[in-house]
């Protein structure tokens, strides 16, 4: 059942149901970059938006899983080139686990939350989406 949910989330993301809200520049999938370093770099530059993806849970007592789609502009150092990218994370607030969606298979790839950079990234995303940090210091 989890595999069906993963594939349906990936299908929604690929179908364009969650689009980058920029009317002057259409999404170009040739510019897509699913690197886990893409969203943090764009976030550092200040060009990003966090969208919460609705998820379904079969077990009402299971800890909530949050799926965040991060749409971002990545600007080159000279300020002339802009690329559009999207990175999708799945976060378990209770267990502090995180995953990155890879669209080639599609599947969720686990990401460590033990490093300072990953804690900063997930805290910033969770603050933007919910107003609270993902991992308290």
Q: Where do the PLM segments sit?
A:
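Bacterial N-terminal signal peptides
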Residues: 11-19
């Amino acid at each position: 059942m989890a595999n069906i949910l993963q594939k349906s989330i990936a299908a929604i993301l690929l179908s364009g149901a969650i689009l980058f809200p920029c009317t002057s520049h259409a999404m170009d999938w040739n510019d897509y970059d699913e690197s886990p370093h893409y969203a943090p770099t764009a976030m550092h530059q200040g060009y990003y938006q966090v969208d919460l993806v609705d998820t379904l849970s079969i077990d009402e007592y299971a800890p909530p899983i949050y799926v965040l789609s991060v749409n971002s502009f990545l600007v080159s150092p000279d300020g002339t080139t802009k690329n559009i990218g999207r990175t999708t994370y799945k976060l378990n607030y209770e267990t502090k686990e995180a995953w990155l969606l890879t669209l080639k298979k599609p599947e969720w790839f686990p990401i460590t939350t033990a490093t300072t950079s990953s804690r900063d990234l997930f805290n910033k995303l969770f603050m933007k989406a919910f107003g609270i940090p993902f991992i308290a210091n």
